Amino acid sequence: MSEIITGLTTKEKLNILADAAKYDVACTSSGVDRKGVKGSLGNSVSCGICHSFAGDGRCVSLLKVLMTNHCIFDCKYCLNRRSNDVPRATFEPDELCDLVIEFYKRNYIEGLFLSSGILRDPTYTMQKMCETLYLLRTKYRFNGYIHVKTIPGASDDLISMAGYLSDRVSVNMELPTDESLRKLAPNKSFTTILDPMGKLANTIGAHRIAVGKSEKMERSGINRYLAGSIFNTDHSTDCRLGDRGVDNYSLIPGSSGSSEKTVAKPADGLLPVMFHDLDRRRPFAPAGQSTQMIVGAGEETDYTLIRTAQTLYQNYDLKRVFCLLYTSDAADEE
């Protein structure tokens, strides 16, 4: 694995980390309508309405970037895997905040999409991402749209914090079956992915009820009226996929999985301040959560992909299940 390059300018880091994020799918309607607030910067009303799309799928109205493309994992389908010889860089929280604000002031972007490789361990990486979001919302008074991809295996407190500081959260499903996950992403498991996904779904539902909304996310168009919709749990068909599918690993939202997690240390960086100052009256991920699956890396049929998506929609009330085409450009030749 290449070492992180030191002495890079912010522009050089941006070139590396924006390019490294191009295989993350983020482009969709934001799902929130928060208006501008006096004394704050930005709003989320127009996000998701006037997006432009680059040829490689990037959404140009969001700054789509990684916190770091360093990664301790070696997922065979990933450009940033440990064994791949690519330039590595890492943003510091304040450095990334400055970049977001300057881009926003120049009307380049309407918001931020933040993902990351894994530096040291999942909790350390998630802490750096939360520090960035916390500084944006407090020090920089940024009120625009934020979509953050959480890191499976990070501490529950930090994943929860990300929900309070962002508009949409994601936990990448990665692959539709356990067999493919074991083969192509041996450091990951359905348990470490579905556990935070379930807890996020539970918290989102509780916050929606607290403000007088239905527990489930609203669906648009004809999906609100179709009894047999893919989202409708009351009229669902059998979603089980045998021994390999997600339904056999589904955790009840809010339940505790058996995954090992590193714990955030109270004295680390901004953690004490963030936990103390976090405004839990803020809406929790008001635009819901989404996920992403790689399609074509394993031997799954279209039927399996659709059934997996249906199970995720019904069990975790996801707003979107994105499918990203497997590409040899990012893949391990093995």
Language-model-detected regions and their locations in the chain:
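Flexible, acidic/Gly-rich N-terminal and inter-domain linker regions that tether
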Residues: 1-70
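Active-site glycine- and acidic-residue-rich loops that bind
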Residues: 152-153, 296-307
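Conserved small/polar residues in nucleotide/adenosyl-binding loops
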Residues: 326-334
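Core AdoMet radical
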Residues: 81-96, 104-129, 135-156, 163-270, ...
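Short, acidic/polar
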Residues: 100, 159, 302-309
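A conserved active-site cap/scaffold subdomain adjacent to cofactor or substrate pockets
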Residues: 309-318
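Local cysteine-cluster metal-coordination motifs and their immediate loop/turn environment
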Residues: 70-80
